């Protein structure tokens, strides 16, 4: 099958032929129909890969800290090999798609082969023709909802979780700073919740779009029109809640939030902007600063995401899977309109060119979609059942016959520390590598 990958060392993008993932218990194998390119988070990752080593270090201080810790533990040579091995391997892209169930793993009873599902996760909803997706990271698509619209499920869940963190109430007024993809969805979700919205973005085209999609007023962060709109809608008290859906290194969004929020209002960070809080402004108003973690409760919990252990609805009403299903329902019922957010649709074979145009600025888009070949071609994937293996003693071999090895597991440590030593040894031949993901097999 084909998959979009990027070499993080060189920044090179490619569409590779990689092995088809197996359909493991607790999940489904999905053939992609549409996958979504996030022009915010995802494009930032693509741009970072094209930076110099110094630029990469400056953009990811968290990774630099891990490298320094590894140097202290393992020494410089081992750390260098590990880091360069990680950088010089292919990394996947994508995290939001819609597709058709191709195979159903053991323990799955809520979907069947041929059903349309929306899938989430930066390890399971990749820009690839086929993905294995665990139960809690997919949701059935409601009848009548177009696959291109269902592909917004993941980013819709991100916006929805941010709105839930703000706890909006009927009649309140909210400020949304940043009117990119997530900001536009937040505007619509708030409007659907009975909240009047003021949007802020330096791009007048995005401001106009947000007003079409339900915002009461929008404007440039530097303009007096935004403050005037807030004063008019709130009687001069300030907005009840602010949603930070902007990115970048400017501290302006955080400062603007404090200036336009009412006393004891709520500020929710959804994007990845600078957060140097002006202490006096936040203290004097006793503002409640909250963070929104990705798609919702369950995110980053392996027991939930990989093992399929759901949280009881009485204790956790909105998990990431229930957020995903809820967003799809809102789009299907016309409460949220994603069609105006689709700036470009590209064939999957043109993925590299599309990324390059987005990166270079030749293609201006709030979001873009990859369209995959028509459904119906069966995947050449391993059978669900694990075959019985009969172990027999190996016959004696000639002294100069190479030892043929099969290697199970090809993660970062194996590919940087173990496999290089094995493949360089005289008389050793690596015949087979078995891994859980298609891309780790390709890297090996």
Model-derived features: positions:
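C-terminal substrate-binding/catalytic core of Rossmann-like NAD(P)-dependent dehydrogenases/reductases
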Residues: 277-341
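Glycine-rich beta-strand-centered segment in the early N-terminal region that forms part
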Residues: 21-36, 45, 49-122
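Conserved acidic E/D residue at the C-terminus of a beta-strand in Rossmann-like folds
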Residues: 201-202, 293, 432-436
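C-terminal capping/lid region of NAD(P)-dependent oxidoreductase domains
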Residues: 4, 232, 236, 241-243, ...
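N-terminal Rossmann-like dinucleotide-binding module
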Residues: 381-444
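Mid-domain Rossmann-like dinucleotide-binding core that forms the NAD(H)/NADP(H) cofactor-binding site
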Residues: 116, 123-124, 146-223, 228
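Glycine-rich cofactor phosphate-binding loops and adjacent beta1-alpha1 units
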Residues: 166-168, 208-209, 213-292
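Short, well-ordered loop/turn sites that connect or cap secondary structure elements
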Residues: 37, 111-112, 168, 261
């Amino acid at each position: 099958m084909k998959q979009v990958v990027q070499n993080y060392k060189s920044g090179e993008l490619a569409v590779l032929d990689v092995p088809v993932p197996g359909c493991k218990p607790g999940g489904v194998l999905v053939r992609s129909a549409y996958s979504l390119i996030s022009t915010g988070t995802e494009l930032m990752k693509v741009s970072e890969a094209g930076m110099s080593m110094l630029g990469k270090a400056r953009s990811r201080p968290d990774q630099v800290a891990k490298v320094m810790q590894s140097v202290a533990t393992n020494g410089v040579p081992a750390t260098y090999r590990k880091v360069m091995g990680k950088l010089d391997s292919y990394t996947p892209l994508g995290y939001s798609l819609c597709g058709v169930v191709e195979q159903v793993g053991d323990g799955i009873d809520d979907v069947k082969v041929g059903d349309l599902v929306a899938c989430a996760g930066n390890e399971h909803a990749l820009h690839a023709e086929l993905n294995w997706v665990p139960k809690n990271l997919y949701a059935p698509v409601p009848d009548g909802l177009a696959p291109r619209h269902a592909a917004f499920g993941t980013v819709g869940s991100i916006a929805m979780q941010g709105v839930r963190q703000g706890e909006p109430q009927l009649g309140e007024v909210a400020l949304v700073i940043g009117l990119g993809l997530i900001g536009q969805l937040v505007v619509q979700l708030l409007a659907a919740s009975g909240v009047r919205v003021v949007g802020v973005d330096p791009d007048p085209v995005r401001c106009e779009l947000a007003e079409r999609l339900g915002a009461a007023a929008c404007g440039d962060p530097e303009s007096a029109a935004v403050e005037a709109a807030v004063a008019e809608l709130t009687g001069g008290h300030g907005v009840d809640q602010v949603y930070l859906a902007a990115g970048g290194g400017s501290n302006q969004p955080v400062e603007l939030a404090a200036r336009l929020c009412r006393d004891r209002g709520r500020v929710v960070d959804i994007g990845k902007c600078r957060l140097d809080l002006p202490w006096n402004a936040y203290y004097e108003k006793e503002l409640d600063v909250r963070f929104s973690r990705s798609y919702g409760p369950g995110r980053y919990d392996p027991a939930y995401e990989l093992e399929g252990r759901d949280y009881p609805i009485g204790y956790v009403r909105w998990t990431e899977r229930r957020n995903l299903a809820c967003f799809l329902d809102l789009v299907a019922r016309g409460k949220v309109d994603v069609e105006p957010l689709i700036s470009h649709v590209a064939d999957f074979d043109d993925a590299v060119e599309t990324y390059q145009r987005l990166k270079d600025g030749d293609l201006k888009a709030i979001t873009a979609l990859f369209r995959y070949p028509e459904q119906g071609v069966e995947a050449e994937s391993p059978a669900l059942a694990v075959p019985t293996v009969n172990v027999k003693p190996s016959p004696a071999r000639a002294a100069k016959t190479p030892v043929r090895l099969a290697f199970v597991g090809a993660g970062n440590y194996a590919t940087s520390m173990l496999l290089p030593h094995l493949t360089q040894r005289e008389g050793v031949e690596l015949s087979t590598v078995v891994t859980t993901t298609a891309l780790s097999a390709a890297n090996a």
